UniProtKB/Swiss-Prot annotation:
<dbReference type="GO" id="GO:1900829">
    <property type="term" value="P:D-tyrosine catabolic process"/>
</dbReference>
<keyword id="KW-0378">Hydrolase</keyword>
<comment type="function">
    <text>An aminoacyl-tRNA editing enzyme that deacylates mischarged D-aminoacyl-tRNAs. Also deacylates mischarged glycyl-tRNA(Ala), protecting cells against glycine mischarging by AlaRS. Acts via tRNA-based rather than protein-based catalysis; rejects L-amino acids rather than detecting D-amino acids in the active site. By recycling D-aminoacyl-tRNA to D-amino acids and free tRNA molecules, this enzyme counteracts the toxicity associated with the formation of D-aminoacyl-tRNA entities in vivo and helps enforce protein L-homochirality.</text>
</comment>
<comment type="subunit">
    <text>Homodimer.</text>
</comment>
<dbReference type="GO" id="GO:0006399">
    <property type="term" value="P:tRNA metabolic process"/>
</dbReference>
<dbReference type="Pfam" id="PF02580">
    <property type="entry name" value="Tyr_Deacylase"/>
</dbReference>
<dbReference type="GO" id="GO:0000049">
    <property type="term" value="F:tRNA binding"/>
</dbReference>
<dbReference type="GO" id="GO:0005737">
    <property type="term" value="C:cytoplasm"/>
</dbReference>
<dbReference type="GO" id="GO:1900832">
    <property type="term" value="P:D-leucine catabolic process"/>
</dbReference>
<comment type="similarity">
    <text>Belongs to the DTD family.</text>
</comment>
<keyword id="KW-0820">tRNA-binding</keyword>
<feature type="short sequence motif" description="Gly-cisPro motif, important for rejection of L-amino acids">
    <location>
        <begin position="140"/>
        <end position="141"/>
    </location>
</feature>
<keyword id="KW-0963">Cytoplasm</keyword>
<dbReference type="GO" id="GO:0051500">
    <property type="term" value="F:D-tyrosyl-tRNA(Tyr) deacylase activity"/>
</dbReference>
<protein>
    <recommendedName>
        <fullName>D-aminoacyl-tRNA deacylase</fullName>
        <ecNumber>3.1.1.96</ecNumber>
    </recommendedName>
</protein>
<dbReference type="InterPro" id="IPR003732">
    <property type="entry name" value="Daa-tRNA_deacyls_DTD"/>
</dbReference>
<dbReference type="GO" id="GO:0097358">
    <property type="term" value="F:D-leucyl-tRNA(Leu) deacylase activity"/>
</dbReference>
Length: 150
């Protein structure tokens, strides 16, 4: 499972010219689920996302506070392209990305656990399987790539 964690001052997602979700201070997550991922990977990712200290404290000392500590929001976007293999040729290979219906079940579980950890209203998401337009203001910029297999 791969999760790109971006610290943002705002983020939003639009599908077919309709605003689906938006947040203020927090994280925009891009979440990729592979055929090898299990519930253990989901649980590990939720712990990492909620506990990673990417925010400064009140004295502006960096890397002191987590999303949970600051009461921040999360906008999570499912993105199978994170699982692409690009080792050979010029066309990405998506064979290791989890199949749609299984990926949806796992992604929904990820969102459920994240909402349990951070609060129902703190976690927003896009539209699974849709073509989405995502925008964000990356603060720092701070962008972390987390992979449960590394």
């Amino acid at each position: 499972m791969r999760v790109v964690i971006q610290r943002v001052s705002q983020a939003s997602v639009v599908v077919e010219n309709k605003l689906i979700s938006s947040i203020k201070t927090g994280y925009m997550l891009l979440v990729g689920i592979s055929t090898e991922d299990t519930i253990a990977d989901i649980e590990k990712s939720v712990r990492k996302v909620s506990g990673l200290r990417l925010f400064p404290d009140d004295s502006n000392a960096q890397w002191k506070r987590s999303i949970k500590d600051i009461g921040g929001e999360v906008l999570s976007i499912s993105q199978f392209t994170l699982i692409a293999r690009t080792k050979k040729g010029t066309r990405p290979d998506f064979h290791e990305a989890q199949k749609g219906h299984l990926a949806l079940e796992m992604y929904d579980r990820f969102l459920d656990l994240l909402r349990q950890e951070l609060g129902e209203k703190q976690v927003q998401d896009g539209e699974f399987g849709a073509m989405m337009s995502c925008s964000l203001t990356n603060e720092g910029p701070v962008t972390i790539i987390y992979d449960t297999k590394e």
